[in-house]
């Protein structure tokens, strides 16, 4: 449609951008890396008509897609609380997060995801244009967490299979990964790393804790 083409031609006017310092929800203090550096993220919320279009894409296309029980971010009736619950009482725990999760999801990966949802190349291209900015997935839009979940789905399934084989509980809340068990599973950490790396993502070593 002509209106959508005009909007895409002026995408820069439909986004805001700022750098935010991460704070701990419980204490209100800045989150820091082990070396004392304050954690930051770039927020890029969409505005006006683009936000409305993205909300429609989310509600009509993305939200109805069923995701594994292990996925808790951006899923109705799931939260960071439901993400933590399955790990209660487990003796051994490994927590880590995905480095630059949103920026690592580029235009091509989003396009491939829409193709995987059986959209024609023409529509997949339009949907990708409407949900990415500066050739990557922006953090802070209605569609980004849902798209990120779908891009990471193949990796999720591999991690779920690995964990099921070894009696490990696995959950993911957006870019935070948690693994736990009653048994020591240190010997499985390399396999976890390999699966994440093969999926085209990186674990943040500064945020990994066993």
For the regions a protein language model found, what residue spans apply to each?
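Glycine-/proline-rich flexible loop or hinge segments
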Residues: 18-45
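Short coil/turn segments at secondary-structure boundaries
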Residues: 7-8, 69-74, 126-128
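A generic secondary-structure signal marking the coil-to-beta-strand transition
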Residues: 16, 39-41, 90-94
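Conserved pre-motif C helix in the palm subdomain of viral-like polymerases
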Residues: 37-69, 102, 136-162
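Conserved polymerase palm-domain catalytic core
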Residues: 86-174, 178-210
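Amphipathic alpha-helical blocks
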Residues: 1-15
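TRNA-recognition modules of translation machinery and tRNA-sensing kinases, especially anticodon-binding
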Residues: 3, 61, 122
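Active-site-proximal segment of RNA-dependent polymerases
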Residues: 50-100
């Amino acid at each position: 449609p002509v209106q959508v083409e005009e909007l895409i031609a002026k995408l820069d006017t439909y986004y805001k951008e700022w750098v935010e310092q991460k704070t701990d929800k419980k204490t209100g203090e800045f989150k820091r890396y082990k070396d004392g550096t304050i954690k930051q993220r770039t927020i890029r919320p969409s505005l006006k008509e683009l936000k409305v279009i993205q909300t429609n894409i989310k509600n009509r296309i993305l939200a109805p897609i069923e995701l594994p029980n292990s996925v808790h971010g951006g899923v109705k009736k799931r939260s960071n609380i439901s993400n933590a619950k399955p790990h209660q009482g487990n003796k051994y725990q490994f927590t880590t997060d995905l480095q630059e999760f949103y920026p690592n999801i580029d235009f091509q990966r989003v396009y491939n995801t829409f193709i995987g949802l059986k959209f024609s190349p023409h529509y997949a291209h339009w949907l990708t244009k409407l949900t990415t900015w500066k050739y990557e997935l922006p953090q802070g839009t209605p569609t980004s967490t849902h798209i990120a979940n779908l891009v990471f789905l193949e990796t999720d399934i591999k991690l779920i299979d690995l964990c099921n084989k070894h009696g490990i509980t696995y959950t993911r809340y957006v870019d935070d990964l948690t693994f736990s068990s009653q048994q020591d599973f240190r010997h499985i950490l390399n396999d976890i790393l390999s699966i994440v790396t093969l999926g085209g993502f990186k674990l943040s070593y500064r945020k990994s804790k066993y």
